[in-house]
A protein has these predicted regions:
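Tandem CBS (Cystathionine beta-synthase) repeat/Bateman regulatory domains
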Residues: 1-181
Length: 181
């Protein structure tokens, strides 16, 4: 199976020149964790922007200064197993699919792989073999600004929220944090 068999072809992209507010609005509106950034009026890939980029420099208004310019990409003919290895080794969640001229053709995300590949595997393996065994937690009355800093410092995309009895009260995600912005 190749990347072209599972990639999303209708890619939501931010454009440069553009503002970080426009990109953040796209991320929130489309409920995604990041976007490829293309040159305005073309399909040429210029960078990628993720929720993490916003937390690193929340006051930056220019998308070109906030986005990651060195983007790891793949091609449509790449084997899915190789794309998975790339995502895991690089520690990234999305892999833009480009043609020979660096024009965006699609995107493969970790979610695509879960829904289109892993869910179809014929396996009886248990989740305990793959689950995270450590996590970061905060108390339910922790100020949002403090929780944001804890999330940034821990590298977590989600925090377990505990009540005064140390019982699970909820989960706070980086997407929840963006809704405040």
């Amino acid at each position: 199976m190749n990347v072209k068999d599972i990639m999303t072809e209708e890619v939501i992209c931010a454009e440069v020149p553009g503002s970080s507010d426009q990109a953040l609005n796209l991320i929130i509106t489309h409920n995604v964790t990041g976007l490829p950034v293309i040159k305005k009026g073309t399909k040429e890939l210029m960078g990628i922007i993720s929720k993490t980029d916003f937390s690193r420099n929340p006051s930056e208004g220019q998308l070109a200064l906030l986005m990651t310019k060195s983007v790891i990409t793949t091609t449509a003919d790449t084997d899915v197993k190789d794309a998975v290895k790339t995502l895991l080794v690089a520690g990234i969640k999305r892999l833009p699919v480009v043609d020979g001229e660096n024009n965006i053709m699609g995107i493969v995300t970790s979610e695509d792989l879960v829904w289109k590949v892993v869910s179809k595997l014929d396996t009886d393996e248990k989740v305990t073999s793959y689950m995270m065994k450590s996590f970061t937690a905060v108390w339910k009355d922790t100020p949002l600004k403090v929780a944001s800093e804890i999330m940034r410092l821990s590298g977590s995309r989600a925090l377990l929220v505990l009540d005064s009895n140390a019982k699970l009260y909820g989960v706070l995600t980086d997407t929840d944090m963006l809704r405040v912005a």
